[in-house]
Each structure stands twice: as C-alpha cells, then as structure tokens.
C-alpha cells in the first residue's frame, strides 16, 4: 500500500476539522515558523497529520562575516546555520512528498522573508506553492486563508532585506571603529545607537536642569453652615517669600465672596484598541511588565489562539470583532453603554498585521494559563471592549472666590461623573505624574455672592520639575513619535541596549531639599521649614559611562547616522519599498538616504581601504571641514582623496 504524503502544518486552530477537509489537506505541506503553533495544530488535526516547524529563519547572513557584496548592488550572501541543516533536510523531504506546499509564516515583513527563504532553499515550484496568511489562529481564519491563497509578496521581502542589509552595513562598519577607538567588543546599530542617544541627552538635560521656586497658595473657606470646607487655589503662583508675606498680609482683613459659578459638560472618549507600542506602554504602566516580557507573553497568547497577531501598527478591528464586542457590551451593560466606533490607522507605514491586538473570542472573559498570561489577556480584552463603548459624561464645576476687590481670585474646580460609559470597564494610565489628570471630586453647594469665612491660607514653596527619565514605556512612545523603528523592533532594541550595558534600568537615590510653608490663620502669619526627598527614580533607564562615551564618539564623527531624521527617513523608505513604490539602489536593491549615507560611507571606505591614514586622521580630530576633495563613484569606490589641515595639503592620492 502506497503511503499518502503526511501533512506538514505550522499554524494553529482550536476546533476539529471535517473528514472531507482532512482528505483535501492530506497531500499538502503547510509550513509556519513557530513550534508552539505546531503543538496547537497537533491537537486540532490529530494523529493523522505530521506537524513541524521551521523554527524561525532557516538561513541568514553569516554571523561573523560582512556577507554583503557592495560591488554588486548589495547582494546578500545567505547561509544555512549549522544547527538548521538537519531541519532543512527534513523539510525538503516532506516538501518532495507533498503535492501542494502552503507557506504560512506570520503576516509581516519578517514572516514574508521567512516564506521566501523557505521557497528558495527548499527548491519549491510556483505551480505547487501558495502563500497563506492569518492574523489569528482560529479554525475560521486558517480555513479562510487556505481558500484565499496568494503569491509571496516580493515587495515585503525586499523591505525586510533592505532593513537587514542596511543594519548590517551600519553595525559591521561602525563597530570595528569603536573597537579601535573606544573599547573592544563594543557595537553600534542604526536604531540602537539612536535610542541610546535619546537616553544620554535626557540624562544631560536632567543634570543641567536648574529648578526655579514659586509658591502655590491654597485657601480653606468655611461655608455659612459653619462646618463645610471649600478649598480653592490662587489663580497665579507667587514668586518669592516677600510677595507671599505681602499677599497674606493683605488678606488678613479681606472679604471673600463667591463671584462666579460655572458648570459645563465634559466627555471622555475611550482609547483605540492596542497596537504593539500601546500594548507595551500600558502593560508597563498597569502591570509592571518590561517591553520584552510583554512581547514574550503576547507571543504565547497568540500561539495559543487567544489573541490576534501581536506585532502590528494597526488600530483597525474586523467586522467580526466589532460584532462580538457589541454583543458582549449589550449582554453585560445594556444598549446605553454601546457606541459603534471604526478606527483607522493614520500612519502610512502601518505595515504589519492589518488588525489591532484583540482577543480572538471576545466573549471569553477568562482563559487558562499562567497568572501573567491571564493579566495581559484581561488588559487586552478590556481595552477592546472599552473602545466600542459610549463616552463617559462628566460635569465640571468651577467656583471663583473674589478677594475684597483684588484682581487675584481663588478658584476651585471639581468634576463629577454623570455617566461612566467606557470607564465602567477601562481607564488609561499615564507615564509621568504631570500627565495624570486631576481627580477632582464633587464640590460643596454654594450660591453666587455668598460670603465665606477664611479658615486659613497656606503658601507652599514648589519647584519646577526636571525632565523625567525614560521608562521602557515612554522610550517606546518617543521612538514611535520620531518614526524610528517598527513594532517588531521596539522590544529587541530596548533589550539590546541594556544587554550591551550602554543603558541600565535601575533606581536612583534622591536628594534632600528644604522648602518653606507660610500660613495665615487667625490673623497670624507663621513660617516653617520642611524637607523632602526629590529626584528619586525607580525602574528608569539611565546611560552608563561607556554608553555616554560611545554616544559622544558617534555624535562627533558620524552625526549623519545618529540623526533622528535620517533614521526616520530610512524607515519611510523601507515602507515605500514594502508598498512597491521604490526599489533598492542600483538593481532595485537598497533604499539610500543619499546625503547621510554618502557621508558615512565615505568615512567607512577610508577605514577599510586606508586603515593607517584613517587611524591617524581620527586621532587628529578629522572633521568634515578637513575634507578638501573627495570623489566616490557609484559603487562607493574611493577615486580621489585629499586631506587638508592648517599646515597645508598632507595627502593626495588616486585609487583605481
């Protein structure tokens, strides 16, 4: 009896499949990259199916070699790692048995590149190879993908290769310079070095910050009932002790009257569903997870079929997700709490999976798994449901207290929630104290022109706050704001700069500071001094000495590589390649940021072709103004070079 080719599947589903579908799929080989998906598929398909994994990329650039042919349009030189050769042989054997091969790696640029490498290495044929994608691991999603296959998107592959090649160029050309000039075994990278720059510059801002003092003045008034207290703040800060004392002196015999009461409705709108970066930020704030920890947990949830793909720029939700969210809201909270919202991704560069991160089954309010997985799943589910709920409605009341004819006023502001809406389910968190909304409660009832008795007025010396150090969450947000990196790069970038010991995440002890409190009560002004600890930080990112040295060296000699705009513009060029709007330089190979790329490539060539001169030149502070003439042909080959200093022309050469 002839054996029927066994099916190789690397995708996931949690539901049984019909006998007819089994017959159709038995002569198919389906490959994805994750062994966890394979394990789930085994439960889904049963013993009649052989399930395997490519375990990520099956080939890559050599680890220790440059592996890029600069003279031939940046052609990459790929190799199969020794630990993958046995697996590749097994995959080849299975592919030969199958009548149809389905490449089902993740739905992003990295996943597309994995499929392309599989296609090339396994020697697959276009007539019996299909590419399928799904952003959730469910029965319906997988079967729909098989019913609607496509070809490999070579534009996405080119975008991934362009990133890989440019990152290799920057890393392999800059790192040896750091070894020679700073310290052995250091590394530089197109994104990681810019991330370190952000942290170094923030630390310098903190060290150079000079705090300015001013007095915040708060009065406590007794209402006519004799017991109710109204607290209100002076509508300006007082600059020094003398001004405070003069103001309090003028208040000793002043009358205080309610001269204005205003009420206005306020609406709060829910945040969109999670993208990769917003999930990383919110998990750090609410759950205390590191960026890499969040992605590791989210990966497990995805591979278990519990959430959609976790590397995405998109805030879109599918029609199915919108419908199930509506059902969950109507069943639990009622029609008043539901509001349809269709979110659209603003960024043109949203190139990852085409849906936000959400539960695959929103009706499932609990899952099995570790405590960490349950907490992250609950966070994702609540955010998804909240984004389809009604606005919260509040009433904001502002009471103005006049001071006996003075232009200054005391102002009290309070909010009361009249309808909680989405706040019934979810409240968004903030990174820094100064971003947090004030939780002002309900104010006591007062009437216009009502006369109040002053209980006391307290002026407390306060100081301007220094810029906050970055947390992992706020660094992700800043990178995203600058257009640096993409969902797949945030976590590894932050992990890399810590592994390299350019940055540490740790605590910083504060310093003791003295401040004044001046009080007016019972016609008497009193002053006391108190102390407080300021500047203490917990779990913040701080540069190490070597991180600062490396940053300063790169900023001095390679400012183009370190420029925020350069790094962001390269990301846009990768996006353009992914959209098919531009090819690679030369033979459609590599998108070049012409100005900065040319500038730092010229320095690299000096180091590669003229190491002794380069070594001398850097030692004697080579800057752009020292170049008198520099000609580079289209292949970045040095043809003419002349170095000029204050003592005249020191070197002139021609290299064919």
Task: Describe each PLM feature range.
Residues 137-219, 263-267:
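C-terminal or mid-to-C-terminal helical accessory/interaction module adjacent to the motor/catalytic core
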Residues 12, 16, 615, 624, ...:
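Short hydrophobic alpha-helical segments enriched in small aliphatic residues
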Residues 10, 26-27, 40, 49, ...:
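Basic, low-complexity terminal or inter-domain segments flanking catalytic cores
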Residues 610, 622-630, 647-655:
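Hydrophobic, low-acid, alpha-helix-prone terminal segments
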Residues 238-273, 450, 460, 565:
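Metal- or metallocofactor-binding catalytic centers and their adjacent structured scaffolds
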Residues 10-161, 430-434:
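Intrinsically disordered, low-complexity regulatory segments
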Residues 79-101, 198-199, 282-283, 376-385, ...:
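Phosphate-interacting basic helix/loop segments used at nucleotide- and nucleic-acid interfaces
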């Amino acid at each position: 009896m002839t054996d029927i080719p066994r099916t190789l599947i690397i995708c996931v589903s949690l539901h049984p499949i019909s006998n007819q579908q089994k017959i159709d799929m038995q002569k198919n080989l389906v490959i994805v990259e994750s062994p966890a998906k394979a394990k789930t598929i085994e439960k889904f398909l049963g013993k009649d199916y052989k399930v395997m994994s490519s375990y990520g990329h099956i080939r890559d650039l050599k680890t220790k070699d440059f592996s890029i042919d600069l003279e031939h349009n940046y052609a990459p030189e790929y190799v199969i790692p020794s630990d993958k050769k046995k697996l590749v042989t097994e995959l080849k054997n299975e592919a030969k048995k199958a009548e149809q091969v389905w490449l089902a790696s993740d739905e992003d640029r990295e996943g597309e590149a994995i499929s392309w490498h599989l296609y090339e290495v396994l020697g697959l044929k276009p007539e019996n190879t299909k590419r399928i994608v799904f952003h959730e691991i469910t029965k319906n999603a997988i079967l729909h993908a098989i019913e609607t296959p496509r070809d490999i998107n070579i534009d996405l592959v080119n975008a991934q290769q362009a990133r890989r090649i440019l990152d290799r160029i920057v890393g392999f050309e800059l790192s040896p310079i750091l070894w020679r000039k700073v310290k052995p075994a250091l590394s530089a990278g197109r994104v990681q070095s810019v991330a370190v720059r952000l942290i170094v510059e923030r630390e310098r801002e903190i060290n150079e910050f000079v705090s300015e003092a001013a007095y915040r003045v708060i009065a406590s008034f007794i209402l006519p009932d004799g017991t109710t207290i109204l607290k209100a703040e002076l509508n300006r800060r007082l600059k020094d002790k003398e001004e405070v004392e003069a103001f309090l002196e003028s208040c000793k015999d002043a009358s205080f009257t309610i001269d204005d009461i205003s009420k206005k409705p306020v609406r709060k709108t829910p945040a969109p569903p999670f993208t990769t970066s917003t999930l990383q930020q919110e998990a750090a704030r609410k759950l205390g997870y590191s960026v890499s920890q969040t992605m590791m947990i989210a990966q497990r949830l995805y591979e278990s079929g519990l959430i959609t793909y976790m590397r995405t720029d998109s805030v879109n939700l599918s029609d199915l997700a919108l419908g199930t969210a509506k059902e969950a809201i109507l069943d639990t909270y009622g029609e008043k709490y539901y509001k349809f919202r269709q979110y659209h991704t603003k960024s043109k560069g949203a190139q990852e999976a085409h849906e936000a991160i959400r539960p695959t089954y929103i009706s499932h309010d609990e899952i099995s798994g570790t405590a960490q997985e349950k907490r992250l799943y609950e966070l994702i589910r609540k955010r998804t449901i909240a984004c389809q709920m009604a606005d919260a409605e509040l009433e904001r009341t502002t009471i103005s207290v006049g001071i006996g004819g003075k232009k200054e006023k005391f102002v009290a502001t309070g909010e009361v929630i009249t309808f909680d809406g989405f706040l019934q389910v979810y409240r968004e968190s903030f990174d820094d104290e100064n971003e947090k909304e004030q939780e002002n409660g309900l104010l006591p009832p007062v009437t216009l022109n009502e006369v109040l008795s002053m209980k006391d007025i307290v002026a407390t010396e306060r100081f301007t706050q220094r810029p906050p150090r970055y947390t992992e969450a706020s660094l992700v947000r800043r990178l995203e704001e600058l257009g640096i990196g993409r969902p797949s790069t945030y976590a590894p970038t932050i992990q890399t700069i810590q592994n390299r010991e350019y940055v540490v995440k740790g605590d910083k002890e504060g310093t003791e500071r003295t401040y004044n409190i001046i009080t007016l009560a019972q016609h008497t002004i009193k002053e006391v001094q108190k102390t407080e600890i300021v500047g203490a930080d917990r779990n913040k990112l701080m540069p190490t000495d070597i991180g600062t040295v490396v940053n300063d060296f790169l900023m001095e000699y390679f400012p183009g590589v370190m420029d925020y705009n350069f790094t962001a513009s390269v990301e846009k060029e990768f996006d353009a390649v992914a959209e098919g709007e531009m090819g690679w330089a030369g033979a459609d190979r590599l998108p070049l940021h012409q100005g900065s790329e040319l500038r730092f490539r010229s320095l690299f060539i000096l180091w590669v072709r003229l190491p002794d001169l380069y070594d001398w030149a850097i030692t004697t502070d080579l800057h752009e103004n020292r170049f008198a003439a520099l000609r580079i042909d289209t292949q970045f080959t040095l043809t003419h070079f002349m170095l000029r200093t204050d003592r005249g022309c020191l070197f002139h050469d021609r290299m064919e």
